[in-house]
Amino acid sequence: VHNLPELNLEHPAVREYVYGATDSVVRSHLREGVDGWRLDVAVDIGFQWLEELTRAAHAEKPGSLVVGEVANYPKEWFPALDGVINFTLRSIVLQAAAGDLDPALAQRMIDRLAAECGTAPLLKSWLMLDNHDTARLASVLPGQRQRRLAQVLQFTLPGAPCLYYGSEVGMTGGEDPEMRAPMRWDLVSAGHPMLAWTRRLVALRRDHRALRIGDYRPVTAQRLLAFERHTDRAADTVIVVANPGAVEVTETLMPANSKLMGTQPLVDRLGGRPRQKLRTGLLDITLPP
C-alpha cells in the first residue's frame, strides 16, 4: 500500500526515525501531549526493538505507557512492553464462562499467568472480552449468566477492563465485518439489563481500591473459580468466587490470608447474600450456577 509502507526496523536510520531521535515519531508526540502508545500487532516488531521503543518513551516522558497487541502468552513480552492486550486471559475467561474449561484447570492457568507475569505488568495490561478483531461477547456467550460471569472476571482480575462499543448493550456480531458494525443506539436505554450490570461492575471497581491496584492471590478451591485481590491494608481485600458450572456448588475455600479475622463479616457486593465469616481461615460457601 503506497501510504502504508512496511518499515525495516533492522535499519538503524529507521529506528532513529521511529523512536530513537529527539524528533522521532514516538518522542515528538509524547512531548506534544500524548500519554502513551498502543502498538498494533506488536509481536511482529519483536522483543529487542519493542524494549528499545519502550525505553525511549519512558526517557522522553516518565510515566508514559506502551501497550502492545500480543496474542501470544504474555510473560516474555514484559518488560519489552509496559502492558499487553491480554488475549490469553481473555481466552481463559471466555472458555471458563462457556463451560468449556474445567474451573480447577482455568484456576491453575490464571494462577500461573499471574505468578509468571507479575501483578505490576498485568495492572498495566488491557483485559477485553471482545474487540474489532473478534466476535462480539453476546455472540460468543449468548446466555446472560455466562456473559455476566465473564464480565465479573473482566472487572476483578488484574488489568484494565477494556470495553468494546456496544457490548454494554448486547450488540451481536460474528466474523469480520459483522463485529465492526455501527453502534446500535436504538439499544441504549436506562433500563437495559446488560447496561445496568456493566455500570454496577464499573462502580464496584471504582469503589474498591484492591480491584484497581491490588495484588493477586490464589484461593484454594476445586469446583469453583476463586481468587483474592488485596493491598497492604487488610480492609482492601476482595475475594472473588465464581461458579461456571450448571449446578449449585457447596465447597470449603481457603483464602490463605492471615490478616482476615474470623470476627470480620464478609459482604457480598454483587449477589446480596447474607454476611458470613471465616472459620479458622476457611470459607464455607454455597454458590448457585
Predicted regions and their residues:
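Carbohydrate-interacting/catalytic domains
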Residues: 108, 147, 158-163, 167-289
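Short, basic/glycine-rich phosphate-binding loops at helix/coil junctions
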Residues: 2, 128-130, 179
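Conserved, mostly hydrophobic/aromatic
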Residues: 29, 39, 66, 132, ...
